[in-house]
C-alpha cells in the first residue's frame, strides 16, 4: 500500500513537470521572430538591470550557503567533535510556550521534548509556559508516562493568555529564579514544534566553540494540515530559509532567532535587558507615533542579541518538525494573512537594525537588510515594465517576460535541491506568486507598520489613540501607499 502511494506521488510529480515544460514550449513557440528589435531596448535594459541586482543577491546567498553547508560547517562539526565532553553544558532548559494548539499536536510536541530531555543525558529542566489547565493536565500525564530520571525536572509556569511575548518573559524569569550558571543553555520551543532526535546534543556544543555566539537556530521541516498548494508553499519557504540561513551563518549574522526552536545562553535569557526587549519591544515611528510590537518576538530577540554585542549562528543538521495549521481554508487568504504578519515583523525591525551601523552588522548583512527594503519595488519592476511595454508595443513583450519568468523559476527550483529539501512541480509558480503577492503585501504593510495581529487567535494590537490621531494614521497610510505606487508606475511609463 505504501509503495503504491509513493508510485502515485512520483507519477503525479512527473505529470506536473511535463505540463510545466509544455507550457514553456508553447510560450516560446508563440513569440514572433522579430521581437528583439530597436523598440525593445529600454524594456531589455530595465528588466536586465534590475535582474542583475536581484539575481546577483540570490546567487550570492546561494554560493555563500553552499560554501557554509558543504565546506565550512563540516569542518566546524569535526572541530566540535574533537572537543568531546568539553562542550557539555552544565544544565539545559527546554522552555515550551503553548496556547490554543490542538491536543494531538500538543501531545506530539511535549512527547518529543520529554524524550529529548531524557535522551540528551544532561541535567535538564523542562519549563512549560501554559495558559490553559487542559494543557497542564496533558503535560503532567505525559510526564508520568515517560517517568524521567532524577536529573530531568519539570517546571510549569501558568500565565494569562495575554500573548506569546508575556509567556516568554514569564518563562525567562522562572529560569532566572533557578540561578543558572554561565555554562547553562536555554532552548526556546514553540507549541507546534516537534523536536527531532538528538537536536539538543547537536546544538549545545557551538556555545563552547564560539564564545561570542549568544543564540542559534535550527533547520525546519514541516507537516501541513492543509491542501497540496498550501503544503508545497510551506515546504518551499523552508527550503529557501535553509539556504539563506546557511549564507548568513557564514558571517555569524543569522537574521532571526526563529521562534519555533532557537537556543540561547542562559546568561542571555536571564539578562533583564533581553527580557525587556522581548516582553515590551516598541518602535517610535515618525508618522505613526510609538507603538508596541505584538508579534515578531523572534526578530526582537535577534535585535537584542545584536544590540548587546552577541553573534548568531545556524545549525543545519539539527532538525525540527513543525505542525502547520493554516489560518484559513483558502490558500490565497491563508498565505496573505501569514505574509502580512511575517513581512510586518521583518519591516518593523529593518530600519532600526540598519541603525546599528556597518561596524556592528558587517558589510554583507547591511546590504541584505537594505535589499529587504528595496525588494518590495524591484520585485514588481519586471512585471510592471512588461505590462507597460505590452500596452505600448504589443503583447509579445508580455510573452517574453512570462517565458523569462518560467525559465528562471525552473532554474531556481533546481538550485533548491542543493538545500536537501524536496522540490515539486508547483515550486516555479509558487516562487513567482511569492515574488509578486509578497511584494504587494510588503508595500501595504510598510505604510501600516502599527497594524499587527496573530493568525492563531483573533488578537490585534489595540492603541488608545485620540480620534484625530487614528484618522490621521489611517488616511496618511492610504495616501502614502497610493502616492508611492503612482510615482513608481509613472516613472516606468516615462522610461519604457
From Swiss-Prot:
E.C. no: 2.4.-.-
SUPFAM superfamilies: Nucleotide-diphospho-sugar transferases
Top-tier EC class: transferase
Top-level taxon: Bacteria
Topology term for the membrane: Multi-pass membrane protein
GO molecular function terms listed in the Swiss-Prot or TrEMBL record: hyaluronan synthase activity
Ranges that cross the membrane: 9-31, 51-73, 383-405, 425-447, 471-493
Major localization listed first in the record, in broad terms: membrane
One example of a Gene Ontology biological process annotation: alginic acid biosynthetic process
Any Gene Ontology CC annotation: plasma membrane
Function: Possibly a processive enzyme that polymerizes GDP-mannuronic acid.
PANTHER family (alphabetical): HYALURONAN SYNTHASE, MANNURONAN SYNTHASE
Family per similarity comment: Belongs to the glycosyltransferase 2 family.
Protein name: Glycosyltransferase alg8
Lineage, opening ranks: Bacteria, Pseudomonadati, Pseudomonadota, Gammaproteobacteria, Pseudomonadales
Amino acid at each position: 500500500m505504501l509503495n503504491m502511494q509513493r508510485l502515485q506521488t512520483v507519477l503525479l510529480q512527473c505529470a506536473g513537470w511535463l505540463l510545466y515544460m509544455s507550457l514553456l514550449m508553447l510560450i516560446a513557440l508563440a513569440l514572433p521572430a522579430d521581437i528583439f528589435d530597436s523598440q525593445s531596448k529600454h524594456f531589455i535594459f530595465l528588466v536586465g538591470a534590475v535582474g542583475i541586482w536581484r539575481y546577483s543577491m540570490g546567487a550570492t546567498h546561494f554560493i555563500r550557503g553552499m560554501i557554509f553547508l558543504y565546506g565550512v560547517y563540516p569542518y566546524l562539526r569535526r572541530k566540535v567533535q574533537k572537543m568531546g565532553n568539553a562542550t557539555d553544558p552544565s544544565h539545559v532548559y527546554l522552555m515550551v510556550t503553548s496556547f490554543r494548539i490542538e491536543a494531538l499536536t500538543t501531545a506530539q510536541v511535549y512527547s518529543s521534548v520529554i524524550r529529548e530531555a531524557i535522551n540528551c543525558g544532561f541535567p535538564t529542566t523542562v519549563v512549560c509556559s501554559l495558559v490553559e489547565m487542559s494543557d497542564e493536565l496533558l503535560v503532567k500525564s505525559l510526564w508520568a508516562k515517560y517517568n524521567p530520571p532524577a536529573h530531568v525536572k519539570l517546571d510549569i509556569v501558568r500565565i494569562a493568555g495575554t500573548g506569546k511575548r508575556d509567556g516568554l518573559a514569564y518563562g525567562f524569569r522562572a529560569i532566572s529564579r533557578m540561578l543558572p550558571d554561565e555554562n547553562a543553555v536555554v532552548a526556546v520551543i514553540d507549541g507546534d514544534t516537534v523536536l527531532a532526535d538528538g537536536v539538543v546534543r547537536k546544538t549545545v556544543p557551538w556555545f563552547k566553540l564560539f564564545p561570542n555566539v549568544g543564540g542559534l537556530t535550527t533547520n525546519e521541516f514541516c507537516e501541513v494540515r492543509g491542501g497540496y498548494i498550501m503544503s508545497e508553499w510551506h515546504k518551499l519557504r523552508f527550503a529557501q530559509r535553509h539556504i539563506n540561513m546557511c549564507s548568513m551563518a557564514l558571517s555569524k549574522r543569522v537574521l532571526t532567532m526563529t521562534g519555533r526552536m532557537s537556543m540561547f545562553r542562559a546568561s542571555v535569557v536571564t539578562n533583564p535587558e533581553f527580557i525587556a526587549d522581548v516582553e515590551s519591544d516598541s518602535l517610535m515611528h515618525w508618522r505613526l507615533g510609538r507603538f508596541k510590537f505584538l508579534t515578531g518576538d523572534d526578530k526582537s530577540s535577534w535585535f537584542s542579541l545584536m544590540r548587546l554585542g552577541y553573534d548568531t549562528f545556524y545549525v543545519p543538521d539539527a532538525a525540527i518538525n513543525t505542525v502547520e495549521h493554516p489560518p484559513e481554508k483558502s490558500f490565497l487568504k491563508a498565505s496573505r494573512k501569514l505574509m502580512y504578519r511575517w513581512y510586518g515583523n521583518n519591516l518593523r525591525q529593518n530600519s532600526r537594525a540598519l541603525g546599528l551601523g556597518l561596524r556592528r552588522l558587517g558589510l554583507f548583512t547591511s546590504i541584505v537588510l537594505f535589499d529587504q527594503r528595496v525588494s518590495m519595488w524591484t520585485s514588481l519592476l519586471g512585471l510592471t515594465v512588461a505590462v507597460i511595454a505590452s500596452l505600448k508595443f504589443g503583447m509579445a513583450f508580455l510573452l517574453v517576460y512570462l517565458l523569462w519568468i518560467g525559465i528562471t523559476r525552473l532554474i531556481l527550483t533546481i538550485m533548491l535541491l542543493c538545500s536537501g529539501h524536496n522540490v515539486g512541480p508547483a515550486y516555479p509558480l509558487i516562487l513567482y506568486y511569492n515574488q509578486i503577492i509578497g511584494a504587494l503585501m510588503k508595500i501595504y504593510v510598510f505604510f501600516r507598520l502599527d497594524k499587527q495581529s496573530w493568525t492563531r487567535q483573533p488578537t490585534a494590537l489595540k492603541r488608545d489613540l485620540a480620534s484625530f490621531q487614528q484618522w490621521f494614521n489611517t488616511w496618511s497610510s492610504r495616501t502614502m501607499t497610493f502616492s508611492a505606487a503612482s510615482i513608481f508606475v509613472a516613472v516606468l511609463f516615462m522610461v519604457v
